[in-house]
Amino acid sequence: MKKLFLLTLALLSLTTIFAQNTPPRRPYVDFVVIPSHSDAVYNLGDAAALKVVAQYGGKGLENVQVNFTAGPDRMPADTSGTVVFCNGEAMVAFGTMNTPGFRYCKLSFQVEGETYREEMKVAFAPEQIQPTIANPSDFDAFWAKTLKQAAKVPMEVEIVPLPEKSSDKVKVSMVKIQSYEKGNYIYGYLQEPNDGLKHPVMLHPPGAGVKRINPTPWFAQEGFITLTIGINGIPMDATDEEIKAKQQELNRGDYAYIGLENKDVYYYRKVYAGLVRCVDFLVSLPNFDGVNVGVTGGSQGGALSIVAAALDPRIDFLASFYPALCDLSGFAYGQRAGGWPRFLAPGSKHEINVSVDQMFETLSYYDVLNFARRIKVPGFYSYGYNDNTCPPTSVCAAINQVTAPKVIEITPSSAHWRFGETNARANAWMRAQCQ
């Protein structure tokens, strides 16, 4: 009986300890920032405002100061001020715009010595944002010549199965494809539904960076034969030391600045041509269904998805998320943001060894906005207003140029990332495009 009593007492003590250490279901200081227009879109000349609702331990904040700064997208602040919480709410008025674009507000407040921060952007007539980049008269001729030359280079494909990365549903292989010129290779992962059937094919180009890429089997799980590629000539089995060496070789990773002096030698020429070579490979596969070809990616991958769809008529649809490389001359026009890598952005420390005019002449042949003008197939496009990597001003300028059928999924609160729900809608849309 005594042992039973002691055991019961011990169990009760443990229960008490666990109850005392139950993690909170929300932070002690909890706040949300809400634009005065529910869709975060304003007409030109409208006054933009944010409502900040904050609680600490379930009680509304009182007499706590909110500091804020505001300005045009990715530009220095032109407005600053303070407001005070009353009954858990503070209203921050942060100005307007008289030209189409985006405006940000950065705010902060302190509770018990802890600083809480948020940044939010709102749009002003975003559908009216127009390009700053020139549209060269010989743009199409330049790319036709480039692709004609690149097509003469044999593919010389090597495929190495990777059973350790495969599953009963998806077969994964390492791929090496010669592209653009002899000795230049694209490396990637081929992921195939492991069912012996024929399937649509999907090209999946990468985000920016000289880095290791990983397989993306989820597209194959959705029924797409997928080629996930790198663009910087790094084999999938490269060592960390080899990747570091490649980073140093490619301007410490800033490869977007290589070859700005001339459109014929700019770094992205072989990258863009390589996208078409990847489609050559995909449509040659025996389990390709012979009909459906898609491309999808985010950031640099979103940019390359637009480029591929514009250059290769075999592509039937694309899904592009917050594309980089859009309207690259934006920062040269004063209060206007340009796309990643944000040439001439305020505070940029990159050395540019050519004239600004020459740089933008070169870039006009590579600006994704000029490829967006030439899209002829349906597209799914998605971005968020709070993106500081690929500013929404640049993304919106490019998407506005697309005249082909398009679905635009805007999630104002997202930044350089997207919600799982957005992915689900994009995947469903891509499946629906397949015949």
Enumerate the language-model features and the residues they cover.
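Gly/Ser-rich "nucleophile elbow"/oxyanion-hole loop immediately N-terminal to the catalytic nucleophile
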Residues: 254-299
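Hydrolase active-site cap/lid region
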Residues: 302, 306-354, 410, 418-421
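N-terminal cap/lid segment of alpha/beta-hydrolase-fold proteins
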Residues: 36-38, 151-196
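C-terminal catalytic histidine-bearing segment of alpha/beta-hydrolase fold enzymes
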Residues: 389-435
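Cap/lid segment of the alpha/beta-hydrolase catalytic domain
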Residues: 211-273, 330-339
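Short beta-strand/loop motif that positions the catalytic acidic residue
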Residues: 375, 381-383
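Proline/serine/threonine-rich low-complexity linkers at boundaries of modular beta-sandwich domains
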Residues: 20-31
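Bacterial Sec-dependent N-terminal signal peptides
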Residues: 1-22
